[in-house]
Curated annotation (Swiss-Prot):
Name under which the protein is recorded: 2-isopropylmalate synthase
Presence of keyword Repressor: no
Compartment annotation: Cytoplasm
Function, as annotated: Catalyzes the condensation of the acetyl group of acetyl-CoA with 3-methyl-2-oxobutanoate (2-ketoisovalerate) to form 3-carboxy-3-hydroxy-4-methylpentanoate (2-isopropylmalate).
Gene for this chain: leuA
Quaternary context: Homodimer.
Superkingdom to which the source organism belongs: Bacteria
Keyword Manganese: yes
Lineage: Bacteria, Pseudomonadati, Pseudomonadota, Gammaproteobacteria, Lysobacterales
GO term, biological process aspect, one: L-leucine biosynthetic process
GO molecular function, one term: acetyl-CoA C-acetyltransferase activity
Amino acid sequence: MNTTISNQTPHIRIFDTTLRDGEQSPGCSMTPQQKLVMARALDALGVDIIETGFPASSHSDREAVAMMGRELRRPTLAVLSRCLQADIETSARALETVANPRLHVFLSTSPLHREHKLRMSREQVLESVHRHVTLARGYIDDVEFSAEDATRTEEDFLAEVTRVAVAAGATTINLPDTVGFTTPEEIRGMFSRLIASVEGADKVIFSAHCHNDLGLAVANSLAAIEGGARQVECTINGIGERAGNCALEEITMALKVRGAFYNIDSAINTPRIVSTSQLLQRLVGMPVQRNKAVVGGNAFAHESGIHQHGMLRHRGTYEIMRPEDVGWESSQMVLGRHSGRAAVERRLRALGYLLEEEEVKLMFEQFKALCEKQRLVTDADLQALMQDATVQEGYRLASMTISDVGSRANALVELSDPEGNRVAETAQGNGPVDALFGALASATGVKLELDSYQVHSVGIGADARGEASLSVRHDGVEYEGTGTSKDIIEASALAWLDVANRLLRQRERGVIAGKTAAVA
């Protein structure tokens, strides 16, 4: 294997550690089969290196790498090992069937870790690094060494550790910000100085592994790239211990969107980002927050009227990347109390409603009133408002009372007729809906034969509404109606009136389905 790699290459290697460091996030453990499913997605995404686990820690991790090794032939598959002979030997055995194996060994280097965790001197750390990197190279040509807690390590000692690891045969040097402590300026300088000063640095790849404890994982990783890093270790959705790791979707899109600035690319197939993110969410049961960059539900959603108006003119006014480039179908114009009339009118037009100026004004007033009752307004809500407006031209539901006692149900409905008069009727039926429809038929004089009837929920959470859909016949002609309300019985009444009022309007025009009107 040729390990002479130029750090001047314009390609950044994406080392995904979702299946190792990411899985260490509380509650995110995966079975070997789940890891294989995720690894397939990472392969399709174009990840260069997949860290599969920590074979010395469990049989499950050993089984997972074996399963991946039998199936995945393109990406490099890495496993993690402590600087212990037994760990390295176990890892080497786990990699025997892997087409492109990498053995990743690590040892803490900071004074805090040396004193309290390892109880080792500088000299002992250097000796261990040399011995175990050499041992690893005896098994695998591709060896990565990580100086754990590198960003809190004295820089002169970190340079010495790096020199020893390179001399022992490491092909990748990883400098982790293990506890998310550093800043972009600091990590940029650290990489730049080490790459410039360590003998043999031009023969290896330098790698960044940043945690997000201060919310700087992506920023620090980008700064490390500016300092000369040519591998970034990251996870899907940024999952990982404590506050997580550098998020793959964020760093790859930062490099793509700001390509002219960074002048470096990755092999990531970005239109697969969202589906990969959603797969991980399902596998580990950890959803991302709605405002999560790139993959959150609000990443390409716009509610503000000013922003929506700008988006309608030119999407570049408020979006720096296309949703399609990361796997979303399109941008979302979220309708809520901040939305303007132009966005509401556009959405109504998309739903098939062509309104006059006065009608748009009235609908927008009704829309604003609805926004005071719920956070978001869906397409179903807009359609319900349009139905309400339509119903106002005919019979409107004023009130209803339903009682279901014994084998028969009773319904009392009160309607406002087209002239504004009140009409009240009662009926009995084989259940609440049957009684309701009977009372409505008596009140309107419209007889409908019910073919099918169903209700389902529309909307989200507390804003959910019941939608009733029915198919009926009148004079042998089939009609369909829908109604939406917080109450499913009321929604059923509105669906029935939707059809009845349509028939009455057709009667006024003198024709129903090609026949002279006779609604009775």
